[in-house]
Amino acid sequence: MADKEAGGSDGPRETAPTSAYSSPARSLGDTGITPLSPSHIVNDTDSNVSEQQSFLVVVAVDFGTTSSGYAYSFTKEPECIHVMRRWEGGDPGVSNQKTPTTILLTPERKFHSFGYAARDFYHDLDPNEAKQWLYLEKFKMKLHTTGDLTMDTDLTAANGKKVKALEIFAYALQYFKEQALKELSDQAGSEFENSDVRWVITVPAIWKQPAKQFMRQAAYQAGLASPENSEQLIIALEPEAASIYCRKLRLHQMIELSSKAAVNGYSGSDTVGAGFTQAKEHIRRNRQSRTFLVENVIGEIWSELEEGDKYVVVDSGGGTVDLTVHQIRLPEGHLKELYKATGGPYGSLGVDYEFEKLLYKIFGEDFIEQFKIKRPAAWVDLMIAFESRKRAAAPDRTNPLNITLPFSFIDYYKKFRGHSVEHALRKSNVDFVKWSSQGMLRMSPDAMNALFKPTIDSIIEHLRDLFQKPEVSTVKFLFLVGGFAEAPLLQQAVQAAFGDQCRIIIPQDVGLTILKGAVLFGLDPAVIKVRRSPLTYGVGVLNRYVEGKHPPEKLLVKDGTRWCTDVFDKFISADQSVALGELVKRSYTPAKPSQLVIVINIYSSEHDNVSFITDPGVKKCGTLRLDLTGTSGTAVPARREIQTLMQFGDTEIKATAIDIATSKSVKVGIDFLNY
């Protein structure tokens, strides 16, 4: 079969199947489809970079594990980023420009409230009444930890009841939609329509395709966009957003931790956290306007960068830590990803889990698990009390940290065990936690620091592994961003491990870095020019059987023709560099000319050298569905060719298709959730 690709090819990036012909349908459930053309990647940036739409405003939602918020910028004033209104409620000493990612449903499972409002209302409920309400927090991690994520995946509320995850995420996004549109309408003095808004939602870079698709489906259900107007919603990768914002930093907007030359008057020899504390005070004094000005040009920090210089972004949030390596392209300041995003579940929640394990050791796992179920609101109160003390942990702290135990904890423990909390502490042999007569757990600084150690050790180990990669050698900067980056213990660990290798920079308003960067990304989605594929992707096809090359067990004889089954036709390799707008072209032919739907299974692997879809480590991960309805002309050709164009250089995998005979567009769906 002749190569039917259009001109403009960059040439093959990978080995094409030696021969690929159309074939009858296979008996294993796949449609009998083989590629008509070899494996080319075509640069077609003019046609596939996100089109400029006539949106009046970009609204970014930073949907975090522990806290969330939104910011926006009018497209005619892209240098002004407005952060959402201050939230009612909040904890002493904690900035409330974000709100906790907590949601409360009524006993009838209707949406009641979100954020501080949900938390405070739940706190004030009678304990028996609270058992009927559905309170959820830190639920974003479910999308990362669930291996078989589907549209029907459940979440567990504080009272143990199950609720659909899609419903909860949609409720949360709908809440932010309503809040943002109301604020925009108030500011504009007239009703602001959703169609005027381009929405941006942030997700961790290490999330797999199903989790990204899940978030998009939740946004559709919340009414932010629709499948018919999918370009109204952009999925932004959190460390990329941070990187985009860091390009704009002025010297007075950053703190340097490394032992290199001082920036902004703070040097690496200062006490870790001291400069950061001063910076936060400066932010609090200047936070009234909620409007941040960003440079139209590259920020001052990039004046020290040359073409090809590299830097690492460490996005340390509540649930995950994302590590991204970027290279600067001057003079425009475009970015190129040098190594596929890496990371893991090493967020500040790890400290909470260690505290929970400590409570297990003192009071018994059976009691703690029962207390969560019987007194869910009191458990939330206890973790809120721990959160405020967690934020006070520091390397140089000498005085104890007191954590108030709710009265219901003390009372329920006595009923459960038959003796007091104080007795439990004495018998536990946990010397570094004492009982205070004021009803508090008194933790020594070393005890609190020990709770941080496993999580911080995992981050440092992951960073060390990353710095061993050839692509990451000679890194000039390390940007530490995300809510967990505020922790002086993490700052000290990063400084100690890498301060002599590169300059370690923390943006002053570190908790809003991703949010503001997501707005900038929504204004210019093409700023990241080159990304790396996290996995190897491809499909299973039939090739002509070649004696001596193909295994005998893969031989299929159909109508006298010898076929090799299960051949892995590779679209793109793991860690392969792919530019925004580069297209992977394939042409497929239906088993029968009258066939109206082609469904092709997509497979993935962490490995590059994949030959067959049955190789170890190869998994079915989704489907590519081509809907041929309405594309055929009056006379259906005996051999139909459907050309499919796939794009792997964006934050999501995208596809388009065309019926070559009629030049009509084919409806394409890529599904990583329902396959």
Swiss-Prot record:
<feature type="compositionally biased region" description="Basic and acidic residues">
    <location>
        <begin position="1"/>
        <end position="13"/>
    </location>
</feature>
<keyword id="KW-0963">Cytoplasm</keyword>
<protein>
    <recommendedName>
        <fullName>Heat shock 70 kDa protein 12A</fullName>
    </recommendedName>
</protein>
<feature type="modified residue" description="N-acetylalanine">
    <location>
        <position position="2"/>
    </location>
</feature>
<keyword id="KW-0547">Nucleotide-binding</keyword>
<dbReference type="InterPro" id="IPR043129">
    <property type="entry name" value="ATPase_NBD"/>
</dbReference>
<comment type="similarity">
    <text>Belongs to the heat shock protein 70 family.</text>
</comment>
<dbReference type="GO" id="GO:0005737">
    <property type="term" value="C:cytoplasm"/>
</dbReference>
<dbReference type="GO" id="GO:0001889">
    <property type="term" value="P:liver development"/>
</dbReference>
<dbReference type="GO" id="GO:0005524">
    <property type="term" value="F:ATP binding"/>
</dbReference>
<keyword id="KW-0007">Acetylation</keyword>
<comment type="subunit">
    <text>Interacts with SORL1 (via cytosolic C-terminus); this interaction affects SORL1 internalization and subcellular localization.</text>
</comment>
<dbReference type="GO" id="GO:0051170">
    <property type="term" value="P:import into nucleus"/>
</dbReference>
<dbReference type="GO" id="GO:0006954">
    <property type="term" value="P:inflammatory response"/>
</dbReference>
<dbReference type="InterPro" id="IPR026685">
    <property type="entry name" value="HSPA12A_NBD"/>
</dbReference>
<dbReference type="GO" id="GO:0005634">
    <property type="term" value="C:nucleus"/>
</dbReference>
<feature type="compositionally biased region" description="Polar residues">
    <location>
        <begin position="16"/>
        <end position="25"/>
    </location>
</feature>
<dbReference type="GO" id="GO:0070062">
    <property type="term" value="C:extracellular exosome"/>
</dbReference>
<dbReference type="GO" id="GO:0042116">
    <property type="term" value="P:macrophage activation"/>
</dbReference>
<comment type="function">
    <text>Adapter protein for SORL1, but not SORT1. Delays SORL1 internalization and affects SORL1 subcellular localization.</text>
</comment>
<feature type="compositionally biased region" description="Polar residues">
    <location>
        <begin position="34"/>
        <end position="45"/>
    </location>
</feature>
<feature type="region of interest" description="Disordered">
    <location>
        <begin position="1"/>
        <end position="45"/>
    </location>
</feature>
<keyword id="KW-0067">ATP-binding</keyword>
<keyword id="KW-0539">Nucleus</keyword>
